[in-house]
Amino acid sequence: MKNLKLYLAISYGLIWIAGGALYLTGTGLNTIPGVIVASSCMLFPLIATLVCQAVNKEPLFRHIGIRWRVNRWWFVGWLLMPVISLLAIGFTWWFAGDRFSTHSEILTLMQTSLNEQLKMDIPLWGILAFTFVSGLFAGISINALVAFGEEAGWRGYLLRQFEGRNFSLAAVAIGAIWGLWHAPLILLGHNYPQHPVAGVFMMIVVGVLLTFVFQYVRVKSGSVIVAAIMHGTYNAVANTALVFLNESNDLLDGCAGLAGFAALLVVGVALFLFDRYVTRERIFTSPLRQ
């Protein structure tokens, strides 16, 4: 684990500096400057990666899994993100009870806006289809480009540091590091505005569960680019469940809440069973390989 401490010091240090600046200036995450700063934080793992490579006198951007040979796992990873979102919608409906409605205020506004733009009545399934299709295209383009800033670190440089260790233990470690890295922004209201302190621990769980999915597809595809596409697409569709709510609970609802935990567990278990009984590679229980 060469230079792991340096990598963590840089990636964590930069986001705490950014979060501290937002806090001291009273800049909210829902403001334009706040959005710009929060989005820029996604570059910090890449910066940490490049600094570590420079210190080690390694070629920059090498050995972090940048491979452009497309295989079926590129598409599997990309399309899994709407599946996770759909599962999260189902579990949100289960947890939310009367708070869940197909006539919620947000959904009604979306439907009215689309009806006016397209000059036709759009059914509920049409709104969902529009949301997922636009999310898929955002995920494979601008969102993937931004998400690469994180994935070059988490599923690139950091994955390499854990190479040779047990896949699942590496996923837990990398996921926990990734989730905790968000702490400064979580404390400022990102993802869990109602429960910022509890949200820090919730985000660690999200990070671990999501890492099992990202890391498995990263290994199967052989490319960190796929992880960036998955991350970008996930960000685009993760909050879809929230449009069905008249009143939300950030610890329960959507991909960041318990509904998301359940959705990720379903997908994670499905991948584990596929790995164990279909391909019989047993990646989940084997030493990690890029």
Question: Which stretches of residues belong to each language-model region?
Answer:
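Aromatic-anchored segments of alpha-helical transmembrane domains
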Residues: 12-20, 82-90, 176-185, 232-242
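C-terminal membrane module of polytopic membrane proteins
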Residues: 54, 196-198, 222, 230-290
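Membrane-interface helix/loop boundary segments of multi-pass membrane proteins
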Residues: 147-177, 219-223
